[in-house]
From Swiss-Prot:
Protein name, entry field: E3 ubiquitin-protein ligase RNF12-A
GO aspect biological process, one term: protein ubiquitination
Organism: Xenopus laevis (African clawed frog)
Key words of the record: Developmental protein, Metal-binding, Nucleus, Transferase, Ubl conjugation pathway, Zinc, Zinc-finger
Tissue: Shows overlapping expression with lhx1/lim1 and ldb1 in the gastrula mesoderm, and expression overlaps with ldb1 throughout early embryogenesis. After gastrulation, expression is gradually restricted to tissues originated from the ectoderm, the neuroectoderm, neural crest and epidermis, and subsequently to the neural tube as well as the head and tailbud region.
Subcellular location: Nucleus
EC number: 2.3.2.27
Amino acid sequence: MESADSTGKGSIEQSESQRQSQMDRLDREEAFYQFVNNLNEDDYRLMRDNNLLGTPGEITKEELLRRLQQIKEGPPQPSTEETRGDSVSTGGDPAEDSSNGDSIIDWLNSVRQTGNTTRSGQRGNQSWRAVSRTNPNSGDFRFSLEINVNRTSGNPSMPSLDQSAEMPGAEDMEVSSQGEAENEPEPIPIATRSAPAEVTVEEAPIQRGQRRARSRSPDQRRTRARTDRSRSPLHHAVDPPIRRAPHSSSQTVDTSNTEEAEGSSRTRHHVSSQVQNSSSSNETEGSSRTRQHIPARQQVLGTEGQSQSTVHLSNPETRSSSQTPQTDSSTNAETTGTGQRPPTIVLDLQVRRVRPGDYRQRDSIANRTRSRSQTPNNTVTYESERGGFRRTFSRSERAGVRTYVSTIRIPIRRILNTGLSETTSVAIQTMLRQIMTGFGELSYFMYNDNDTDPNNPTAVSPTAAVPGEAQNNANAEVRAPSAEPTEPVAPVETDEGSNVSTTATRREGRNSRGAVTFEESGSLPFLSLAQFFLLNEDDDDQPRGLTKEQIDNLSTRNFGENDALKTCSVCITEYTEGNKLRKLPCSHEYHIHCIDRWLSENSTCPICRRAVLVASNRESIV
């Protein structure tokens, strides 16, 4: 009897405990709904975008208030002086920036969830700013990178040619979206550093009276010695067609050696690309060959105060009409055979380096006059398409501030719609290698400038190797760092009929010149972007949810006392007066926090399974 009584008491206590637990949960749910209903639009989005709302009934109202207050205040940011002092004390070693890798990954991963974010900071002489914006109607996503480097604020004891001091900082990202901007439907989290990029360059012969940039390593000196002996028909003002090396499986690369005068000496500029000033250059529409217009020389005395050296890599069928690659990439629409623009990734990478001395006087009349009289107006344009990948490069300098811009446009086509023979993973990896190739070329711009003595007014700064034609069967190959070097090579068919292999593995081509190996800093954000665009094969076939921007575009309302009694189909809870509801195009309504969480992982209505957005407005990466 005693055991039976104890068992009965135990069951009663257990049932009472369960009932109390259920009551507490109901109270927490009611408090949760009241908390959400009282939030303004900005606070609600802030908590939703940072996944702070949790599940109704599992978190107290006090905890929600604490989370809201904490996310509003934000983590304490280190002062600029402390950050600058830390950079100087560590000698500006890029390896020190690796600690910021996790925050970069988190930020990039949140782009997919938040749609719009802003971030900025400074470390030593490197400042950066990051903004992410998405167009909810078209799903357009534009990714831009801007890095500002003030060489005068670094450690004065560092040598001017020190790579770690010259290269841009760790996490300088600026993301902007425009209605007409091309689209990167869904950013993917990045991983670790990329492998170093290798660039094999054939330079034009150095002419008498010119000074060659100082080499950093014996390997580079040997390379330049070999390339100096090679002859390139860059001095003829003719338009040769593209040549392909017979023993090379990769697209051959033309040599461009653009010298820049920074003192009183005059330099000549022999460029193997199409000159933007010569806008009358004829390009055959629909032709599989891209013609380059090579001027015998360019004017040394520029007519404008701002000198630009712009190298454009773009679709030959869509010529660029602007000298600003960012404008070009955002205003030119890329179309498919059916006339519809496929989703496209747009990456704008911008690096600004400030030269010592000129920066302090960059606004002075004397400096503007010196810049106008001594800096040539050498604008160079090159247009090409590699399997649909458009790239634009530019370099400009004004009053000691040198700017490099690399714009890459990558159309992301669906396998089923375009009939591509590649699998999804191979297509994604091909896109990755194309992106990294462009980053490697941009880095080579800065690498050549690092070889130039900034204190030498007559030092020559050659530009980066630009894909084009091969001279004398000598290949100048631009290779990109691959996030996974063990992956098989994925060649890309080009308009010229040649294959481009952009892996980081060394190619033992018989006609290749000595490689100029550029050990790129792993702290550079656009090198860490390798796996940012490398998708999981399993994720490619899974349905994706909507972005926060697209969700926010759906209509909302408050449940009134005169409304018919209804129940949210997600949480199975009846609506009460004041509840915020979100209405889908199919007319079904749900609690705003319930349906928002659903739509972050799904794109259909939970009841009727209809698509919330039409296919053309949804974000898709394949």
